[in-house]
Amino acid sequence: KQLKLLFQLYERYDSAISTSDIYDELSERLLEELDYRREAMNMQLYQHMLADEKKVQVPSHIPELSTNRLLTMNWLEGQRLMVFLDTNPDQATRNEIAKTMFRVWYVPFYYYGVIHGDPHLGNYSIAKDHSINLMDFGSIRLFRPQFVAGVIELYKALRDNNRDQAVDAYERWGFVGLDNEAIDVLNMWAEFIYAPLLENRVRPIQQMRGGKAGRDLAGKVHTELKRIGGIKPPREFVLTDRAAVGLGSVFMHLGAEVNWHELFHELIDDFSVDALAER
């Protein structure tokens, strides 16, 4: 009720975003955060999805020490990111951690249609061998194969400057009733989010996401959304955007200098909607 009231107050003050689907999505995810049986199953799911990833550890659920109100798992030794960065790791180490984080988040998404929707700094740690300990499996989202295909399709649309393909991608995501002005604003946002992936070269992510340029673009998108009467983001959009922005922040903390385009293509080049649906 409090969350709904906050969203209602926000919409009265700011018409840029219609929050009804955002409220429905976050309400459902927050309730799932309290379902420890579900979180234990999510943990097992991530152990399966990341079984071939050598640089990540997922804790194991200990059922005999767990109840509906208590979730117990084995201990994973590691340092929080900011503590680790205080040790002044070299650039190569920072880059390797960033690459691992990218795969930890997006192998499940592109191969299984699943995303960890909460990449804040408390939900993973860095082990001594610089692998990742992934934690907190309460905010896990399953996506339609067509939605995942739409994420890839939008990348190709931006790369090829194909407006019709971008519109098709937004519709796969669940946007409805988009006019030309709304599409222009969404493309402005998308070019910002996808920027690290579009050029096949090593780039520090802070060149594209940080500082005044990022703030100016966010302000411009917000202003334009208000001018055109706002948009209504579909439910599935919420956690994918949250994950992308959250990971971008992690990569900026790391000061990562990586070929993001290459990493992305390692995951999508063999993508098949049918294969994803079968998995």
State each model region's role:
Residues 122-126:
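Hydrophobic residue at the +6 position relative to the catalytic HRD Asp in the kinase catalytic loop
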Residues 111-121:
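Catalytic-loop of the protein kinase fold
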Residues 14-18, 38, 53, 116-118, ...:
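Short, surface-exposed helix-loop/turn micro-motifs enriched in polar/charged residues
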Residues 103-110:
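Flexible, glycine/threonine-enriched loop-and-boundary segments that flank and lead into catalytic domains
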Residues 70, 116, 132:
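Hydrophobic "anchor" residues on beta-strands that sit immediately upstream
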Residues 1-82, 96, 100, 112:
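Conserved ATP-binding subdomain of kinase catalytic cores across diverse folds
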Residues 24, 67, 76-78, 83-100, ...:
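Helix-rich C-lobe and terminal helical cap/extension of kinase-like folds
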Residues 39, 72, 120, 136, ...:
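Residue-level signature of catalytic and energy-coupling elements of molecular machines
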